[in-house]
Amino acid sequence: NLKAPAILSKEFSKCVVKGNNNIINIIDQRVFKLTPYFFSYTLSKAGLYTMTKTSAMSFAPRIRVNGIAPGPTIKNKRQSVAHFKKQYLATPLRRQVNVNDICNAVDFFIKNRSITGQVLALDSGQSLNWQTPDILGGKEWRKIILKFSE
């Protein structure tokens, strides 16, 4: 989640001279709403968030660097359909993030040449929501979280 983007960004920066060059990192909304769960994953994505900001400064003006921090988009392999639905229904917009939404955000970053060093929370408002089940707690939710954070 961090090493490969760092290496690719560094090598890409050596290859470009001028033009409309972009690096768009896929981060995670968890960098905006930290929890103690998924520790190593969240830590690596927080590192990618910081790398996005510092790379934008380092690579300018040749390369613009931005990020997208999606919320619930696709059910992970260890997650039940019911759990995934519960997760996205707990967001303020009560909908999962559509892959087309992410593609549109990539297009937005490419077309808007005055944007660099920004990370867009594309998460149906999940990073704003302080009353999600993982924050509210409860024995059932804690068991589910611990199962997925192994």
Which stretches of residues belong to each language-model region?
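Conserved mid-core alpha-helix of short-chain dehydrogenase/reductase
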Residues: 3-11, 53, 96, 101-104
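Conserved Rossmann-fold SDR core element
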Residues: 49, 59-73, 115-122
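C-terminal substrate-recognition "lid" of short-chain dehydrogenase/reductases
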Residues: 98-122, 127-128, 133-134
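Acidic active-site catalytic centers that drive phospho-/nucleotidyl reactions
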Residues: 1, 45, 66, 101, ...
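Glycine-rich "substrate-gating" loop/helix at the edge of Rossmann-like oxidoreductase active sites
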Residues: 38, 92-95
